[in-house]
Amino acid sequence: MSKTANEAMEKRKAEGKLFADTPEWMIKGMIAKTLVGRFNRSWSINIPKRVILEKMIFGSFGKSWIEPPINIAVGKNISIGDGCYFNFNTVLLDDDKITIEDNVMFGPNVTVVTTGHPIYPEYRATGAMYCAPVTIKKGAWICSNVTILPGVTIGENSVVASGSVVTKDIPANVVAMGTPCEVVREINEHDKIYYFKDRKYEDGKLD
């Protein structure tokens, strides 16, 4: 594909139109996946090596921690703040921007997707795809086996329960669950007293 054709696809992608993959993007993806492979094989105690790889892989990466393995598409479209924790098997398909703000927690097997394909099979057969960015606001907790789809924003401090498929925005300070994911309640005073079922916070203080 020529430089002009590649630029045309970049323009279509930026405008939210259907686009197709390009050789240049494929090469960038292969380089990113090679770096991620090195990260996934690194020793947990070799923190300096991991810090170097994180800077090479991601667009920006704060003081956060990833439990390998992790998988990405591009890497440079991902922005991660401070105080975040990612449990095992995180998947970040970042053909568009993924923004993860400070103090976000991921359980195991969380998938964030920015790319989709047409439902109509003849269009899909051409390799056409579309993108929409995903934002996860500060303090959110994404529990295990959650899938977040293109164009979604998760609000500050919200909790998305295990096994949910998030197809639309979730507001701040709520608990949401289900397939498709829906808000079930707000985070409230009860949550200040009980941290799990009948277990009171005063029994679980860390000091």
Describe the function of each predicted region.
Residues W65, V113, V175-M177:
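Structural detector of well-ordered beta-strand residues that form the stable sheet scaffold
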Residues W141, V159, V175-M177:
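Short-chain dehydrogenase/reductase
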Residues I57-G59, S64-N77:
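A glycine-rich, hydrophobic loop/mini-helix early in the fold
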Residues C143-D169:
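Beta-rich strand-turn-strand
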Residues E10, M56, T126, P133, ...:
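Short secondary-structure boundary/capping segments
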Residues M1-K63, C181-R185, E189-D207:
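Terminal amphipathic alpha-helical/low-complexity segments used for targeting or macromolecular assembly
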Residues I70-I80, Y85-T153, T179-P180, E186-F196:
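Flexible, glycine/small-residue-enriched loop-and-beta-strand segment within the central core
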Residues V165, P171-I187:
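A contiguous, mid-protein "functional segment" used to position or interact
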